[in-house]
Amino acid sequence: MANLIALPLLVILSVFQTAIVNRLPLLHGTADLILLTLAAWSLHERVTSVWFWVLLGGVLVSYASATPFFAPLIGYVVMTVIARLLRRRVWQTPILAMILITFLGTFIQHGLYMGALFIRGVTFNWRESLNLITLPSLLLNILLAIPVYAVISTLAEWVYPGELEI
Amino acid sequence: MNRLNSRSLRLAVLVIFIVGLLLLALGGYLTPLFRLTLNPIITVEAWLSSRYLAIHDMITVPKDVARLQQRNAELESQVTQLQAQVIELQQRISEAQVLYALLDFARSRPDNQYVAASVIGRDTNPFISYILIDQGSDAGLRHGMPVVTNQGLVGRIDAVTAGGARVQLVTDSASVVNVRLQSTQVEASMTASVTGELALQMVPTSASLSVGDVILTSGLGGSYPANIFIGQISSVRKRESDLSQTAIVQSVVDFVGLKAVLVITNFKPVDLNPLIPTPAK
């Protein structure tokens, strides 16, 4: 069930991301809906089908983007590993965990993007990139983290219903 | 005989009385009398009529209110539909204006063949500047084809699928465009920063650069056709100790609000990679 809904949901989110979200930048930074969705999904305690979602999200983003294939995928995988580790430790405060994962995920993803540019031989100003791209993206991601978490949590509870206590 | 006379007399008196009354009425002599007698009647009738209408309204108005509310809802629905139509038509006008501008541009350069495409998305990675367009190899688009608007150079095709393509903008940090200044014919390479700022790099200090100089593609390198408008120099960075100077270029294309583009399909980019010598191992 979880894997079945992953494809349409992540495809719709990818389309929404490229068609709308990327056209609404703050300075030069943009929010990453796929990252937020995967973070929220990974943090949910009952969710077991995580890696398929991560793989699919990474492939979809890589397919539409000119970024080297490995960068988004590795970023999502690393973020998910941290989210799963964090889930076991601070699961009582999922909102805090979501914000922390969003913070780390954004930096990891942008670090990989910058690494990919560096490998391609593109010279760029680190401070300018941080101030004009990464920090605005982080702010947008943190602003969207709570609503995305709420929606994805509802979805996760629908997909993985809890056991009734009699 | 007496009875007959008596009847005739009564009739005559009656006629005279009626005629007299009529004459008095027509002459206006009975108006005060009429007023005195009719006013109470009119007052009573008015009171009765107003009470009747109040009762009638009390009974019938709820039906009217319901009907009016229904009608109001219908009209509001119509207004909403019309507003939606107005917005749609305004959007079509906006699209049509863009397409007319592109058409004018295409007509002004009849030697080129164009395919018009709409911009449908932007790259997820904020460090690079790519757009997605809704025409692909089915429309004859190939890798490397230049992309322009009526304002100037946009970029070139980076990847193609059957129904779509990805365009590397000239504002992408990995993009290099060989350009020349229209006024002095000085040639240079134009690159971009990760934030999309265009700059002419490594221009010899002997070359004269000034604010407002028009930048065109030079055609060198075979990546872009020559003489496509790019923008103007907005500032020059030149220091005495430097071996070269740098100029910031203000592009004429609004890359943020890009809606439609033209792909030049009869230009075949030259791949210089085989000609570039590789270091011997």
Predicted stretch roles:
Chain A
Residues 1-166:
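Terminal, non-globular segments
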